[in-house]
């Protein structure tokens, strides 16, 4: 009998920590359920984005992972990206107020219902397509990622922003 205990973004199985991954159907369902708990009046516990902007930001991140958007790598990412890459897929929380890729920083007003549905559909498509259809293009800051790193990173990114809004 295996004992499973949830620890932050991970599962603990007999001494092995397994990071949650958006390619796992149960982890995707958990994220979608949490997104459904948001409402237009959800307030951030940190950061400057409102809830609709956060949903649009997460959707823009999905576009990168799906190979629909190709932001250029900046000099800082080229310099230190590969060294800090584990931030994306280790079991430690993403630091609050960590700076983001400028091309997915959302400052204009967005419509909540539209952004929520758009993000949910992108997550579903990404999960259904599976790791084999994940982009082979580099992340604009962290550089080359395997599909497993993308899957863990997407889960962790979504989890970070959902916690930002209390769900």
Outline where the language-model segments fall:
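Long, hydrophobic N-terminal alpha-helical segment
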Residues: 18-53, 57
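Membrane-proximal intrinsically disordered regions of secretory-pathway and membrane-system proteins
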Residues: 24-25, 121-123, 152-155
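Active-site rim elements
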Residues: 21, 42-43, 105-110, 146-147
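Short, Lys/Arg-enriched N-terminal segments with co-localized hydrophobic residues
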Residues: 2-18
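Short, contiguous alpha-helical
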Residues: 43-89, 136-167
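Alpha-helical membrane-targeting segments
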Residues: 18, 68-110, 114
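Conserved, structured core segments of small domains
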Residues: 43, 119-126, 133-135
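Short helix/strand-capping connector loops at secondary-structure junctions
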Residues: 97-104, 132-145
């Amino acid at each position: 009998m295996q004992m499973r205990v949830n620890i932050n973004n991970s599962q603990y199985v007999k001494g092995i920590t397994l990071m949650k991954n958006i390619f796992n159907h149960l982890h995707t369902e958990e994220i979608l359920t949490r997104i459904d708990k948001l409402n237009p009046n959800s307030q951030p516990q940190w950061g400057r984005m409102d809830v609709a902007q956060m949903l649009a930001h997460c959707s823009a991140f999905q576009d990168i992972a799906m190979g629909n958007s190709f932001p250029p790598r900046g000099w800082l990412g080229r310099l230190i990206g590969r060294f800090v890459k584990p931030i994306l897929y280790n079991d430690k929380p993403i630091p609050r107020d960590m700076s983001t890729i400028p091309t997915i920083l959302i400052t204009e007003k967005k419509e909540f219902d539209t952004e929520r549905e758009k993000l949910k559909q992108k997550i579903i498509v990404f999960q259904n397509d599976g790791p084999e259809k994940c982009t082979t293009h580099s992340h604009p800051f962290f550089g080359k990622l395997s599909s497993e790193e993308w899957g863990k990173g997407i889960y962790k990114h979504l989890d970070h922003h959902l916690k930002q809004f209390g769900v």
